[in-house]
Regions:
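Short alpha-helix
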Residues: 108-123, 128
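A conserved beta-strand element that flanks and buttresses the S-adenosyl-L-methionine
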Residues: 66
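Adenosine-cofactor binding site in Rossmann-like domains, unifying the SAM/SAH pocket
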Residues: 40-57
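Conserved beta-strand signature within the Rossmann-like core of class I S-adenosyl-L-methionine
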Residues: 92-99
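Short catalytic micro-motifs in class I SAM-dependent methyltransferases
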Residues: 69-73
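Conserved class I S-adenosyl-L-methionine
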Residues: 16-25
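A short glycine-rich, Lys/Arg-flanked "PGG" loop and its adjoining helix->strand segment in the class I
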Residues: 79-90
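Conserved alpha-helix/loop element of class I SAM-dependent methyltransferases that forms part
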Residues: 1-17
Length: 155
C-alpha cells in the first residue's frame, strides 16, 4: 500500500469508512485499506472504465476518493478532478499522487501550479500540496521519483 496514503488515512479518519480508488490497477491500495477495515471500490481500464471521461460510481458518495499515479496518464486531466468531486460526499477527503516536473523518468509531469490550476472552478478545496522524493526499487527501475501530493476536501 502507498505509505503516504496509509499515513493520510490514519491521520484523517479515526474510523474506517468507504473509499473509491480511481485507477486501482492490481488493487494494492484497496487491499491495504480493506485490511484497515475500509469498504473499497476501484476502477480503471482493466475494469472497463476510461478515466478520461467523467465517472460516477453507483455506490457514491464516498468518504475518501484517491488516485495514485493516474492523472499524468490521462489526456483529459481535469476530468479526473471532476470525477473525484462527483463521487465524494460533502466534506469528504481526496488524495492524489503524480509525478512532479523534476522527475526525469515520467513522460508527463506537473508543477505545483499546473496541478493546482486543475482545481479552479470545482467543488474541491486543496488543503495540502507537497513535493518529495521516493526511491523506486521495483525490478528494472532503481531510481528516484519526484512526487507531487495533493490532498483536500469537497466543499
Amino acid at each position: 500500500m502507498n505509505p503516504e496514503l496509509k499515513e493520510f488515512v490514519l491521520r484523517e479518519f479515526p474510523v474506517a469508512r468507504k473509499a473509491l480508488d480511481l485507477g486501482c490497477g492490481p488493487e494494492v491500495d484497496m487491499r491495504g485499506l480493506q485490511e484497515l477495515g475500509w469498504v473499497c471500490d476501484g476502477v480503471d481500464l482493466l475494469t472497463g472504465v476510461d478515466l478520461n471521461y467523467l465517472y460516477q460510481s453507483e455506490n457514491a458518495p464516498y468518504d475518501l476518493v484517491y488516485s495514485n499515479y493516474v492523472i499524468q496518464k490521462l489526456v483529459r486531466s481535469k476530468v479526473l478532478i471532476f470525477s473525484i468531486a462527483k463521487n465524494l460526499k460533502s466534506g469528504g477527503k481526496f488524495f492524489i499522487h503524480t509525478f512532479e516536473m523534476a522527475d526525469e523518468v515520467a513522460k508527463k509531469r506537473f508543477t505545483e501550479e499546473s496541478l493546482r490550476s486543475l482545481f479552479v472552478d470545482t467543488a474541491l478545496e486543496i488543503e495540502s500540496c507537497r513535493q518529495f522524493k521516493i526511491w523506486d526499487d521495483e525490478p528494472g527501475h532503481m531510481h528516484y521519483h519526484h512526487i507531487l501530493e495533493v490532498t483536500g476536501k469537497k466543499k
